[in-house]
C-alpha cells in the first residue's frame, strides 16, 4: 500500500506519518519546507520522542519526500492508495489544486483503483471542507468520476505535539505525548476498509468529533487563555494553578453535559475521559506554550469551534455554562505580537467594543444574556 501525506511538520511526522509508516505503508511526505524535504530524502528516517510515564525514542524509517508544489506530487496522487493531510485548516485550500490535478491524471490513466483522502486536521469535518476546495478546482467533466472513485473520509485526531525543543537542532526530530487517537468515518471509504493500527473506524464520527472538540480542544484553549492572563508560560504551569484548573474542569464538565444529553455518553466514562485530559495537560515532558495553544482566537471564538459550539449546546438544552463563559471572556483578552488574529481581535474590540465584537466573531446575539455575561467577565479582567 502506498500513501502520500501532505504536511511534514511535527504533527505529520510525529502522529499520522508515524502511524502509516509503522503499519508498513510506503509513505511519501509532501511539504514546502525544503530543509525538511532534503533531510527526509537524505536519511529516509527520523526519530520520534514519545513522552509520558515511560519515555521512548522510536525510529520511523523507509520514508520519502516531495515538494507539495510541482509535478511530482501530482504524479503521486495518480498512483497512491491513500492521501492524508496535517497542514492546518487554512492550508487545505492551498493544496486542493494539486489534489485536483492528481485526480484528473488518475482518471486520464483509466485507473479504477479506489483512493481515499483523509484530512487529519484540528477541525470538524475537515475532509468534507477539503472536498469542497478540490471540487472547486476540478473540471466539470471530472466531477462524476471523482465522486464514484475517490473517498473523502472525515476524521477526528487527537495527540498533543508541541514544537520540538530539540537539543540537537535536528529539523526532523519530534516530541509527542503517549496518548493518540485517530478516528475515521468508515461510511465514507471507497473500496475495502484499511487496517492500520492506531486508526479506529466508526459509523458515528460526530460523537467523537464533538467529544474531542468539547473536551480536549475546549479545555486546552481555556487553559491557554486563562494561563496567559495569569502570566503562566506553559499549559502545565497553568493547569497546576488551582483557580485555573477549577474553571477548566468546570468548563469541560459543562460541555460534557451537552455531549451526555446529545449522544447518550456514559456520565462516569466521560468523567474519566475529562480526568485523563487534565492529566495530559499536566505532562511535565510537554513544554507546550500557552501562546502557541491560544493562537488564532478569531477561529477559536467562531460559532462552530471549541468555545462557542459547546456554549450553544448548553443554551439548546438549558444547561449551566458559567465556566465556558469565563473561558470566552479570557479568549477575548488574548494578545500576541506573533499572531495576526490576536491583533485583529484587539483592533475589533477597540473599534466596536467587546459586546459588538463578540457578537460579530461568534454569531451570538449582541443583546443576549450570555453575551452580557461574557462582557461582564471580560471587563472584570481589565
From Swiss-Prot:
Signal peptide start and end residues: none
Keywords of this entry: NAD, Oxidoreductase
Catalysis: reaction(s): D-mannitol 1-phosphate + NAD(+) = beta-D-fructose 6-phosphate + NADH + H(+)
InterPro entries on file: 6-PGluconate_DH-like_C_sf (IPR008927), 6PGD_dom2 (IPR013328), Mannitol_1_phos_5_DH (IPR023028), Mannitol_DH (IPR000669), Mannitol_DH_C (IPR013118), Mannitol_DH_CS (IPR023027), Mannitol_DH_N (IPR013131), NAD(P)-bd_dom_sf (IPR036291)
Keyword NAD carried by entry: yes
A biological process from GO: mannitol catabolic process
GO cellular component: cytosol
Residues the record lists as binding NAD(+): 3-14
PROSITE patterns linked to this entry: MANNITOL_DHGENASE
Transmembrane feature ranges: none
Pfam families associated with the record: Mannitol_dh, Mannitol_dh_C
E.C. numbers: 1.1.1.17
Family, per entry: Belongs to the mannitol dehydrogenase family.
Designated name of the protein: Mannitol-1-phosphate 5-dehydrogenase
Species in which this protein is naturally found: Klebsiella pneumoniae (strain 342)
Amino acid at each position: 500500500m502506498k500513501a502520500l501525506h501532505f504536511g511534514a511538520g511535527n504533527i505529520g511526522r510525529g502522529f499520522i506519518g508515524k502511524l502509516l509508516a509503522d503499519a508498513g505503508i510506503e509513505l511519501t511526505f509532501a511539504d514546502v519546507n525544503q530543509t525538511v524535504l532534503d533531510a527526509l530524502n537524505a536519511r529516509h528516517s527520523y526519530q520520534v520522542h514519545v513522552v509520558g510515564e515511560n519515555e521512548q525514542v522510536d525510529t520511523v524509517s523507509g520514508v520519502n519526500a516531495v515538494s507539495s508544489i510541482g509535478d511530482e506530487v501530482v504524479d503521486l496522487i495518480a498512483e497512491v492508495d491513500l492521501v492524508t493531510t496535517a497542514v492546518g485548516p487554512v492550508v487545505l485550500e492551498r493544496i486542493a489544486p494539486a489534489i485536483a490535478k492528481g485526480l484528473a491524471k488518475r482518471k486520464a490513466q483509466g485507473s479504477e483503483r479506489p483512493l481515499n483522502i483523509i484530512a487529519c486536521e484540528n477541525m470538524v469535518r475537515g475532509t468534507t471542507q477539503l472536498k469542497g476546495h478540490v471540487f472547486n478546482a476540478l473540471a466539470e467533466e471530472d466531477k462524476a468520476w471523482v465522486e464514484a472513485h475517490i473517498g473523502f473520509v472525515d476524521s477526528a485526531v487527537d495527540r498533543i505535539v508541541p514544537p520540538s525543543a530539540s537539543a540537537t537542532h535536528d529539523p526532523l526530530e519530534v516530541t509527542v505525548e503517549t496518548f493518540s487517537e485517530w478516528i475515521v468515518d468508515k461510511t465514507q471509504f471507497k473500496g475495502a476498509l484499511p487496517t492500520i493500527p492506531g486508526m479506529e473506524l466508526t459509523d458515528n464520527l460526530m460523537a467523537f468529533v464533538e467529544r474531542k472538540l468539547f473536551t480536549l480542544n475546549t479545555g486546552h484553549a481555556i487553559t491557554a487563555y486563562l494561563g496567559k492572563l495569569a502570566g503562566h508560560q506553559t499549559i502545565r504551569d497553568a493547569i497546576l494553578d488551582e483557580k485555573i484548573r477549577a474553571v477548566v474542569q468546570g468548563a469541560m464538565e459543562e460541555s460534557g453535559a451537552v455531549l451526555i444529553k446529545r449522544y447518550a455518553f456514559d456520565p462516569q466514562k466521560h468523567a474519566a475521559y475529562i480526568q485523563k485530559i487534565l492529566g495530559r495537560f499536566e505532562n511535565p515532558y510537554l513544554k507546550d506554550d500557552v501562546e502557541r495553544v491560544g493562537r488564532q482566537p478569531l477561529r477559536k471564538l467562531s460559532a462552530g469551534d471549541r468555545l462557542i459550539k459547546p456554549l450553544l449546546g448548553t443554551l439548546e438544552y438549558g444547561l449551566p455554562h458559567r465556566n465556558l463563559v469565563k473561558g470566552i471572556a479570557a479568549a477575548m483578552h488574548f494578545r500576541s505580537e506573533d499572531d495576526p488574529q490576536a491583533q485583529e481581535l484587539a483592533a475589533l474590540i477597540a473599534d466596536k467594543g467587546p459586546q459588538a465584537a463578540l457578537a460579530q466573531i461568534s454569531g451570538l446575539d449582541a443583546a443576549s444574556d450570555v453575551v452580557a455575561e461574557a462582557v461582564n467577565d471580560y471587563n472584570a479582567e481589565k
